[in-house]
Structure formats: structure tokens, C-alpha cells
Amino acid sequence: MATKNEEILRKPDWLKIKLNTNENYTGLKKMMREKNLHTVCEEAKCPNIHECWGERRTATFMILGAVCTRACRFCAVKTGLPNELDLDEPERVAESVELMNLKHVVITAVARDDLRDAGSNVYAETVRKVRERNPFTSIEILPSDMGGDYDALETLMASKPDILNHNIETVRRLTPRVRARATYDRTLEFLRRSKELQPDIPTKSSLMVGLGETHEEIYETMDDLRANDVDILTIGQYLQPSRKHLKVEKYYTPLEFGKLRKVAMDKGFKHCQAGPLVRSSYHADEQVNEAAKERHRIGEEKLGNEIGTDTNN
């Protein structure tokens, strides 16, 4: 028989999703295996994988291997001793983005604290290769803090992504428990320096709720992000990946997420996605700047013309 606490924390109905396994989804999954590529969508058990892969033509590639040197207590990605870098990975990612005809791609990476450059050179090369083969696809990067190595950050930002995403994850008080190898202030500095290096590139961060934070702490985190020129915020429900991970302390209702979004917009964020199933890459194609949106428009027009030509033939 469930305890009172377990009954309170049982997953609510609004966290149930309808799976969409259309051709886009199944084709992408097959290609990932054939190309020996990894996606955070799968590794981190993202609840939106069917919507993004099946409907929005977006995907999040995870590079620099599938094993992370850190062991954050909320994350489902494998941890341990990573493999050697795969120098052919940038080309394979770029080719896959082209074959899938993605509108928006997010390139994230495991933390590579074992590498002198934190993997920044291969990361930047991946962005460049994707851009070369896919000029109409917008590119978002989601790196770790690279151990606070700002030369590595400069290398990465020089590749000119369309969005720099670096997640604060939780409020200041909970950071040591949630992600012991990172620090709250280093995350803020990473975001600030990213904006200083490339002022025209939107910066973005994500916050999980349900770990025991208060509303006041959430608002303080919003203020800290805005004070460091962060443009975009996503807020989503923390879901426990396994019994080894941190427990969910609270399930926020859709109404509460709506209120958090309003507060964020009132505080000056240019864009905020907030909801039970929102993750840092959720609807990311809508968050790019005007230049990237124009590339989207041209790409969609080109795709429409190609489909029309094929139909006529």
C-alpha cells in the first residue's frame, strides 16, 4: 500500500503524453544508430522526443562521447571514464542534419573535464561543419561550464551559433546538492561572458522546479539571470530518472507554470517557455534571432519548391 507521501507525489495526469512515432521519428532513430551518434533526447529520457523528432524537425545531438565526467544527481546521462574523442564526429553530425533536413539543431555535449580544452575545439568544429552543409538550419549550443575555462568558451563562441544555452538548473541554495561539480556563480559568469564575446547571439538558460525550491528562490534566480543579460528562459518540471537520482519534492501545476512564465516576462526575458514537460531545447526553433528566422524562411521556401518540383515530375 502506498504511503501518504507517495500518494502526494504520484505523477499527475498532465504529465501523461501521447506518443507520435511517425516517419520522421522512426527515420531519425534509425539514422542515429547507423551513424553511431548520440542524442540527449534519448540519453536523458526527454519526454518531448516524439514531438520534436516527429513534428518539429528538431533534434539535440550529444557529442564528445556518451559518458560524462560528472555525476549530477538529476541527470540520466552515463557517468565514468570517457572514451577518446572521435574526430570524425563533426562531419557525421553535419551529414545527419542534412539528411534529416532539420530546421533547428541543438548540439550539446557531455562534460569532458579530462580534456585540456574541455572538448571545445571538436565542439566548435561540429558547429562549423553543420553550418557549411546546412546553411538554413539554426544551431543552438548547450555546453557544460567547461570547468570555467574561458579560452574554451571563446573558441566555442567564435563558431557563431545562433543561440548559446547554458543551464542554471536550480536555485542557488540547492546547487551543491543537485550538481556538486558546478557552481551557481560560475554558471552566471559563463552566461555573462558568452554575451560579452558575441553580443548579437541570444543567451538562454533553463531551470528545473520540483526539487524543494521556494517561489522566492525562483524569482531570485530569474533576477540573477537577467542581471547577466540572459535573454531566454525555460522552466520545466524535474522528473526523477531512476531511484538513484534525487526525488521529486513537488509537482507544479500547469497554472503555476503559467504564473512563473508571466513573472519571467515581466522581469524582461525576451522569451520564456514554462510548463510541466518543458526542457531546455523545447520549441527552441522559435527562440532564435531575426537573422536565423529569415534563414528558416528561405529554407522552408526552398524545401517547398523542391517538393513541388518532385510532385510535378
Swiss-Prot record:
Annotated Radical SAM core domain residues: 54-270
Residues that bind [4Fe-4S] cluster 1: 41, 46, 52, 281
InterPro entries linked to this entry: Aldolase_TIM, Elp3/MiaA/NifB-like_rSAM, LIAS_N, Lipoyl_synth, rSAM
Cofactor(s) in the UniProt record: [4Fe-4S] cluster
PROSITE patterns (alphabetical): RADICAL_SAM
Assigned EC number: 2.8.1.8
Residues annotated to bind [4Fe-4S] cluster 2: 68, 72, 75
Location(s), subcellular: Cytoplasm
GO-annotated cellular components: cytoplasm
Co-factor binding details: Binds 2 [4Fe-4S] clusters per subunit. One cluster is coordinated with 3 cysteines and an exchangeable S-adenosyl-L-methionine.
GO molecular function: 4 iron, 4 sulfur cluster binding; lipoate synthase activity; metal ion binding
Keywords for the protein's UniProt record, in alphabetical order: 4Fe-4S, Cytoplasm, Iron, Iron-sulfur, Metal-binding, S-adenosyl-L-methionine, Transferase
Catalytic activity: [[Fe-S] cluster scaffold protein carrying a second [4Fe-4S](2+) cluster] + N(6)-octanoyl-L-lysyl-[protein] + 2 oxidized [2Fe-2S]-[ferredoxin] + 2 S-adenosyl-L-methionine + 4 H(+) = [[Fe-S] cluster scaffold protein] + N(6)-[(R)-dihydrolipoyl]-L-lysyl-[protein] + 4 Fe(3+) + 2 hydrogen sulfide + 2 5'-deoxyadenosine + 2 L-methionine + 2 reduced [2Fe-2S]-[ferredoxin]
Signal peptide: none
NCBIfam families (alphabetical): lipA (TIGR00510), PRK05481.1 (NF004019), PRK12928.1 (NF009544)
Protein name: Lipoyl synthase
